[in-house]
Amino acid sequence: MDIHRCRFIDYTPSAITAMAFSHKSGQNDSMPNNLLLAVGRASGNIEIWNPRNDWCLKTVLYGGVDRSIEGIVWSTGEEELRLFSIGFSTTITEWNLHTGKPLVNQDSNAGAIWSIAICDETKTLAVGCDDGSCVLFDISGGPGVIEFKRVLMRQTSRILSLDFQTKDHLVGGCADGVIKVWDLSTPNSAIISRMQVDRARKGEAALIWAVKSLRDGTIVSADSSGAVKFWNGKFFTLSQSFKLHLADALCLGVSANGDMVFSSGIDRKTIQYSREGGKREWVSNSFRRFHSHDVRCMAVFECKSLDVLISGGMDMMLAVIPVRQFNRKNHRMISAVPQRPRMAVAPKARLFMLWNDHEVLLWRIGSPGYRFLLKIVLADEENISHAAISPDGELIAISSVLRTKLYQLQYSDENVKVETVEDSFLSNIGASLLSFTVDKNKLILVSNDSEIFLIELSRLDSRQLEVFELSQPTSKKIAPRQRSNVSSMCDGICSIAVSSDGDYFAVADTVGNIFCYSLSNLTYSELPRVNTYVRAMAFRPDVRGRLAVATAGNQVYEFDVQSRKLSEWSKNNSTNMPKEFSQLLDKAFGAFFDSKHPSRFWIWSANWVSFFDLNLQLPAPRAAGKRKIEMNATVDGNLNDKKLANANSNGISNYGTGDSRCFWITHKYRPMLLVGSVGNSELLVVERPIADMLMSKSMPASFYEHKFGS
């Protein structure tokens, strides 16, 4: 099989700018069923991660132009989770976690907001502004209600960081090098303490980038001089000071019981401070470097079964670090490439497409190279949520959270002519997923609240396209927007697949529900539920009505759509996955079948590509040996027996030889944006090496420490 290995795509994700866990830590507490991590990026998008199943991305809340996320807080209630964000504007945004849209935008009635904090006990939201105002809002009215409460005693400097010490004391770190404490119990919310930090370099006032309050009342600050200071929370006096950072300390993390503090910043060091055995004094135990550029934010969560420190910054990757074994256990870096692919392939036309923020780019796979064809730039403020291209490349659909646009393409030897298909329905509905049928006569649209629409495209010249709203499952399992239960939030449709014969399409959600629709009579059938998040699925081209599914638990299932049961292959093999596959940390990003071997179910992720032959039985489980990866591994040409021999020496594992190979996996290609079939016996592999991302023009230089003699 020939592989087109592509590395020229200039795709660089946005920096991570803010993050927060949905629940407060408790070392002796059980893990909440609905524990989530919100990660904000400079593009304005917010990613919602599930710590279960080795950190799966549940959904993305899409932002827009000049809406960088600079602060995130959660309000945790018995009936709902509420998510609030700020972004260098005068607006506080509350997000609808069911639809992914902003629920309400509340103006601060002050300057641009730089910091945000929340007190769940009193349902009070506090924001700090660049004009020195600190504004309180009441959120006790429920989702969508943010009511102005009052403005605290004014001061003149920008408020860079906020945290509630108690329900009556609010701590703010300011741009004049002073930590201020407001007493909210007094009528005028007076400032009861001012704590001055040391001046930064060149005599300038230090910028206090982060403040945190511990359970015993201790206040911790991090500032632009690189200092981390511990303050007595009762008398508001300095207890201890550490100046271990070589540049600005930007963020702080605190353990559940307040016995550990972590700091990081521009110098990339993550430093651990601890107070052990009931001692009053803090000590700096150790430091490690996990990131290659500035660390902008961190969050800590601890419970009985989980203790993690998550950090992120300019290098776009999430670091997952053990809290209690900080300097003893290995950390994990979650790849910067998007877990929901931002690329698609049109196999008949040998085209592939990339979308990002507000633009879509299109290339043709030629012989011997690639040819850039088209760039579509949207005038909308909202970021692109999804896009799709028809198999013959003549139609492209692009969607945001508010609207969908359809384009018709005509190709000539030198140019591509683009015409916009105007339609009032598409102009007023956003989509989370889009897919064309094989004959391009229908567009399947999944709305932000998991409604499914079928748009008839056979008569594009008509004034109004024919639209069918498909019936929803009666159990409402796949339409969680109707329910108020916390556990249903973000559990919308996450995957879609269309059969190559045009008879069926299937949708699946993040809790394992799978529904298959008939394109002829638009009825649906419910398939057996899998036990975890459906990551990718595809229909077999050689057997009618067979759907293969890859889950977040690293399991592969095959369903017979007509009987609504597992196939014989799945009954025999789904619980017998090879260790090389079942123990993978990176979950599947996509799946497909190739035309030369139509029974081979290809699955790929950021750092691996594999296939299962669904006509062959897997052998009995065997222990997974240590995988050795050589950079000169040669599997980018023909996948023949000679190149697949000696599996462990080149990062490849396979069961069987030739056409009798029932399983194969390689770790050579990394990290990947797309893997897809582009013709008979041809694969397209699009890589975006991390080194190329970090050297892109948009990436600032990392901190450099000049040493004597260097």
Curated annotation (Swiss-Prot):
Its main location: nucleus. WD repeats lie at residues 11-59, 64-105, 108-147, 154-192, 199-241, 290-327, 328-365, 488-527, 529-569. It is found in: Nucleus, Nucleolus. InterPro entries: Quino_amine_DH_bsu (IPR011044), UTP4 (IPR046351), WD40/YVTN_repeat-like_dom_sf (IPR015943), WD40_repeat_CS (IPR019775), WD40_repeat_dom_sf (IPR036322), WD40_rpt (IPR001680). It comes from the Eukaryota. Pfam families: WD40 (PF00400). One of its GO terms (molecular function) is snoRNA binding. One of its GO terms (biological process) is maturation of SSU-rRNA from tricistronic rRNA transcript (SSU-rRNA, 5.8S rRNA, LSU-rRNA). Component of the ribosomal small subunit (SSU) processome. This is U3 small nucleolar RNA-associated protein 4. It comes from Schizosaccharomyces pombe (strain 972 / ATCC 24843). The gene is utp4.
